[in-house]
Amino acid sequence: FKERLIYRPLETLKLTGRVGYYFRERNKPGDTQDRYRGFSGGMKANYTFNIMSNLEVGYTFDQYDKSDYQSLYKNDVRDYSNVQHNVHALYNYTFNGKHTLTVGADYLRDYLMSYQFTDNADHTMHTADAFGQFDWNPTERLNVIAGLRFDYFSDSNVRHLSPHLGMMYKIGNCSLRGSYSQGFRSPTLKEMYMVF
């Protein structure tokens, strides 16, 4: 099932909550069944300070498990579990009705236990990022976007700074675009530790 609830305690504040649950069972030869469970939930708050600025903060939780249920012994043995906690914040401010500053940050805690790991081991990693972007419109024809992002990846103690610059110039019905950027993507726990 999936449910979503929206509540507005103030004209300037919107709260959103969601929850979901999933269960499936599959019979196997003998007295064992595969069981699959998923649970997810989250909360988000949007606050509008004024016509120029707003803030969004949120938290999400996601868990997916697989287990072998031995009906003879009524034993439920979990052999796979993935649990994620995610927190994010995003702030926007508009200058003169046409230039926008955006800043934000994210944090993720990822836990994974799997039968595909050596000795059914488990691993945990933390990733975090902070970013800022300025959308500048000096004329009706010219748009410039400049941004900077910082990423942290706990498993390798990696820190990475990624710049971005983009420009667009309109000539009649045509638009000329150019951009430069760098990026970073941390590997997942599955990519790092699973033995296939």
Question: Which ranges hold each PLM region?
Answer:
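Flexible loop and strand-edge segments within Gram-negative outer membrane beta-barrel domains
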Residues: F1-Q84
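Surface-exposed extracellular loop regions of Gram-negative outer-membrane beta-barrel proteins
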Residues: K2, T12-G20, L55-Y69, T100-R109, Y111, S154-S156, H160, ...
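Residues on the lipid-exposed face of transmembrane beta-strands in outer-membrane beta-barrel proteins
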Residues: E3-Y7, M43-Y47, A89-Y93, A130-W136, ...
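Outer-membrane beta-barrel channels and translocator barrels
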Residues: R8-T12, T48-M52, T94-K98, L108, ...
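A short acidic, helix-capping loop that chelates divalent metal ions and anchors anionic groups
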Residues: R26-N27, L112-S114
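Amphipathic, soluble alpha/beta structural segments
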Residues: K74, Y80-T94, T100-G104
